[in-house]
Structure formats: C-alpha cells, structure tokens
Amino acid sequence: VLEPDLKLGRGGLRDANVLGWLELLDPELLERDRAVYDAAVRVLLDARVALHRRFTRPSDVLLLQEQDGVAADLGYPDADDLMAAVAGAARAVEWLTDDAFDRLDRGGRRWRRNRTRRLGNGVVLRGGQIQLDEPVAAEDTAAAVQLLDIALAAAHSGLRIGRATLETFAAAGRTFPEPWPSEIKDRFVELLRSGRPMIPVVETLDHWGLMVRIIPEWAPCRSRPQRNAYHRFTVDRHLCEAAANAAGLVARVDRPDLLVAGALLHDIGKGYPPRDHTEVGVEIVEDLAPRLGFDAADTVVLVDMVRHHLLLPDVATRRDLSDRGTIDGVARQVGSVPTLRLLQALTEADSMATGPAAWGEWKAALVRELADKTAHVLAGGSIEDAVSSQFPTVDHRRLMAESRRSVHGEGFTLTVVDHDRPGLFSKVAGVVALNGLDVLAAAAFSDEDGMALCEFRVEPSNPDADAIDWVRVADDVERALDGRLAVRARLAERARTYVRRRPLQARPWAPFDNKVIFDNETSANATVVEVRAHDAIGLLHRITSTMAELDLDIRSAKVQTLGDHVVDAFYVRDQSGGKIDDEEYLAEISRALGAVLRA
C-alpha cells in the first residue's frame, strides 16, 4: 500500500493487538513465532511513534510526503527501505493473524480432525489443511515436486498449507535443481495458471522463505515499495497480481505458459535499483528462463516480453496510431504476431495489476487498435491499409468546405472548425479545462483553403460529475475564439480555487521530473514533442499556447494522466510543413516549454 495505516490497516498494530488478546486464550499461540511477532510489532511501533512526533495532531497513516522524514528519523538509508520494512512487518502480522484464527477455528471443528483424503505424492487433505504425509524427499527434484504439488493442492482447494508441513520444508533446506525438468516447470506453470487462488499460496511460501528457493532472484523484490500514486502494490505482490490476471487471458494467446511466466517476471528488474528495471530484467530473464526449464526459443520470447512490456501502452497512449512510422516501428520491435498477442495480453494484465488509473476503456481501445494494426502488418498486410486515417472524415471535410465556424460537442468528443489562425488549438484546450474536462487525445488538421479542424476526446475530471454540458462548452468556445473570454486569466483563477478546495490532491513532492523530449524517428513528416510534467489546471493550454508563439503547427496530440503527472505527446511541424531538425530551434522550443513547466 502506498500510504499504509499503521494502526488499522491489514497487518497493522490493531491486528497485532488481536494476536495478543488471542494469546490470552491460548498461551502457546505465538510460542514458535515470538521472534517474528516481536520484530514486526517493533517496526510498526517505531514508525508510528516517529510519525506522531512529526504531526501536531494524531495520525496513523504514513503519507508519502512524510516517508522520507520518518525514514531519516529512524535511521533507514531512505524511504524505500523504511517502506519495505513496514510492508514486511505488516505481512508477517497478517500471516500470523490468519494462521492463529485458522488454528482456533479448526480446533472447534472436531468433525474435521481425523478425516484424511489422499491427493497423491504424499500430499493429503487433513483437518481442513493441505499437508505432507511423508518425509521430504532426499533428492532435490523429488522434493521440489512435492512442494509444488502441495502448493497446487492449496491453490485448487482454497485451503491453507499446514504449518508443520511448511516448517518441515523450511528446515529441510532443499534447493531446486538447475535447469528445472519438465515435471517441475509444468507444475509451476500450472500454479501460475490457477489465477487469484495462487496469490495467497505464493505469499505463504514467501513467508517461510520458500519462494526464494524456487526463484532466488525473487529476494530483492520482496516487500519492495513502488512509491508513486500510480502503483498500489509492492513489486512482488504486483508480479503475483499480474500473473493472476494473465491466467484469465490465456485463451487469447498461443502459449499460455509463456504468458503467465512472462507476467510473473516482467518487472523483476525493479528489485535491483538504481538501474533501469527493464534493462536489468532482460539480463535476469536471459539467465533465469533456461534455469526454469524453458528452451532457447522460449527464452527469446520471454526476454522480448520483459524488454517490450511497456511498448504497447506507451506507444498507444503517446503516439499517433495513424502514422505509418508508429506502426512500422512497433512491428519491427515485436517481430511476430504470436509475440504481439502475448504483449497485448501482458499489457492488460500488468495495467490491471498496477491500479485503477492504469486501465480503462479508452486505454484498452488504443492498445487494441495498435495491436490490430501491427498484426495486420506482421501478417503481410500493407502498412498503408493499416494506417489509413479516418481523420478528417468526410463529414469533417464537408464542414470545412462551408468555410464558416462550427462548434459541436457530443458524447465525449468536441469538434471545432474555424478559419485557421495561431493559437486556435490552445484556446479550445483552455476552454476544455475551464469546464472541468480532461483531454484524452486531440487531433488537428488544416486545409489549403485556410480552414482548421480540431477534435478533442475528453472526459470529466470528476468521475462523479453529471453529463457534459455541451451547450455551455460550445458557448465558451465561441466567446474564446471571438476574443471575448479571458481564457488564461480564468484558468489562473480556477487553478487557485482548485488548490484551495483540494489541498491534499496537490503533491509537488511526488518523485517525478519534468522533461521535454524530441523524437524525429517515429514519424516521417512530423517531430514528436513529448512533455512529462506534474499535472496542473490549464497545463495543456499553456503548452500549446507556447507552441503557437513559436509558430509550431500541431497536427495531433496524445494526452495521458498517470496519477499526479501527465505525459503529453504532440506531433508538430514548422511553418514550411516539415519536421524540425534545426538544433537551435529545438533548443529554443525546449527552453520555452521548460519555462512553462517550471511556472
């Protein structure tokens, strides 16, 4: 959890108190877990006391902006180490609490105690638990098969693994052979394919130190925080969530085994900062996949899944999907339709595991469009057919041929036609922001007769807002284009009001750097200007106003909000209608946009 409640959160101090109260009923309840329990409670108490010392009022929620200070007060190297310790402590308390209630519950169900159902390979269902009914095998392969059979039985039944069985395996110290034979690999893949029931099983194995015996590279990912407003899980839990989501998508791909394995491993490089997690992940999986029993060809695919796991979502949300350079570039990187479909499913599984802001109908449609166009090219189809643009449409051209202004809003789309002039795009963008709307994507077009077209795909900033009042929006656009609406001044007023009414939403301390990036490779006839910045009211208006001042022609735009920041991409041309390759001009654009982002 990004901002854990140290007292009332799952695995927090209240749960620890409950364990203490249960111990009054059963003095032997924590006898074997005393060291783990005491260490976990100490971490949580220390963090809570340090947090209270920093607040003038009681607070048990360890907010993101307080984590660096609390970490320093407690002597942690940084906030990541603090949050990893807190997450690990909470998991320990959570597991101990669940185990305690399970033992007490089973103690009151005498009818279950002596019922035994044999599941094979020494695995039994007894007393409502999955247990091993024979010694751990002396040979590593046989012991690994036993452990995975137990894990599979727990996932399939939804029952807990018996504590004695876990203690036995933990004490046995068996390691997994290298490379894995098929009987181990197949069982592990089956465990991943069991979906959500797999998650508590993996977390149980991890609690007992068994997950790192299965995959040693898992260790640095354990309880590792992802300290941004976009992710809701630690790295290890995120990987499990992604694999569980992928299990529900296996019907879409030719190789379900590669999909779930790739989902489990796609972010494993995040356990090894400060290097780029994708680069590290590629190196890890190049070595790890063969050890897990995947042959050379499958290893190449798994490595490609790690290398390109952000390719589809990044391109779909930041690049023009009607530009042949976009589709050609993705096709060249992916290489085949089967790999493309694996990446498409991985994108969905990964995004859903990230958080509610990371996946929705709009993003899903963009990824699907990109994947389908790329698949068409990879299957031998014409790239011209794949990127045949539907913008401007026949209706758009008919409106432009009338040589008069037209402002129309319907559904989630605002379409504006007017005589071409500098700043038209930015004025409309400003009106959109004034009306409490977020821009998801935008496109612009100018014809030889001096008419301009702008189309904005929008959604309300407030998800609970009523339907868009298009009459009001259209009236504001008309006034702005006539010079009768002070767009910039009104946006400044709205920004001040927004900050006063929603102070907790402004998070300037979030770890994110403003950047302006130029891409002259993706498109054959436009320069892509990518702007990464903290979100703010009217930001799109200020950026595009600055571009207009520099005589940049905006052909299309992709706008994406990621938690508290945005990644906007603009396809722009110079006055002659070409790409911008003059270094001095690019530097001036960067200087101007940098000033906007710092304001």
Can you annotate each of these PLM segments?
Residues 1-229:
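Non-catalytic interface/linker regions that flank or bridge core catalytic/transmembrane domains
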Residues 117-135, 157, 207-273, 510-514, ...:
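Active-site-adjacent "gating/activation" loops or surface patches in catalytic cores
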Residues 26, 213, 248-257, 271-276, ...:
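Secondary-structure transition/capping motifs at alpha-helix termini
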Residues 44, 178-180, 228-229, 288, ...:
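Short low-complexity, flexible loop/linker segments enriched in glycine and/or proline
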Residues 8-15, 35-43, 85, 197, ...:
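Secondary-structure capping and boundary motifs in well-ordered enzyme cores
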Residues 16, 47, 205, 242, ...:
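His-Asp-centered metal-binding catalytic motifs of divalent-metal-dependent phosphohydrolases/nucleases
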